[in-house]
């Protein structure tokens, strides 16, 4: 039976799909966060005993402060400034909302995963998620990558929670990843493939029993992964795989170099990095336009080798690309915002990895998926993910880590109590032997 918390989380996540124009597009859920969390949730937090939440709050506050400083120095327009700052504010409020309702009710992670899936089914993909390469691939590839793949991944995660005792589920998840790669959804497939393999290694601890075994396991995984990658490239070059973004293979001088293919597939991130280096200290401001055409030329050079065009062809409505949450922070607001964002991402990645071995079996695949997906999203997904999908990963990782830490502390207390009881029993027996002659 659905309780109030479950219904609230379902409706809240679905509310991100209902948008209207208010100094840019804003959803019902974001407007709800701006009112509900500061008035209802934040006053209820027991900050004196919430050291982790204080660290996260401080990191977000520092990021927001550097963003405000950057926007002031750059002299950015008010609408763009408000849009950039709103993403950070909503990200923090989204995280706090989920942590508040998931605390003590880890089972609501299932409702959260289902809500993510339902949102994709009802509202589809956000156009901001699509890079220029994605649009150029056509409707079929975009439909697979931004609609079908996320739905299948969320459905699989939900099933892994329900049927967690089925020990071969991680391998099935890896097979799903291989299928998605072949069909053209390389990033979604790669995340699923890596998630399944890592989860399988964790569940079969013989692979992680010592450092030598762990190193050997990673070498084997890298070798197998590259062998599959080389086979995929050879089939694309032979014309046997033509789906999705396979055209990018032909743009590479050496397609068997995965880094070169990554540059072709995520050229906006590399261009964004160059834009970051051009204005290293305080960035270009939120959502800056490429008025000189410099970054448009770089994009064309990386996509099809055509690196020159006339000034009349420059689009003054072309935003400087980044397609990376982390790089985008530096490109927009400079190195201090970049480091602040990097700290936030690294903090949750570290907590997630620390929870791998102690996580409840029911949520092990989910945890590994969100950790790997968080890393990929931070590196190669647009800035809008910081307000919507990344707080979900933050909250899931935080709750699972807190639960594992609590279980460890409870186990330590039980062990201490048992040792004390055993010590008292031995002490009593010794005392009885020593005083036996007195009683007799």
Q: What is each residue range found by the language model?
A:
Residues 80-86, 207-213, 254-280:
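Cytoplasmic juxtamembrane interface segments
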Residues 259-263, 267-278, 282-333:
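Long extracytoplasmic/lumenal interhelical loops at the membrane interface
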Residues 253-254, 314:
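Intrinsically disordered, low-complexity segments enriched in polar/charged residues with Gly/Pro
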Residues 1-251, 318-434:
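Hydrophobic transmembrane helix bundles of membrane-integrated enzymes that assemble
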Residues 435-440:
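Short, charged juxtamembrane terminal tails flanking transmembrane helices
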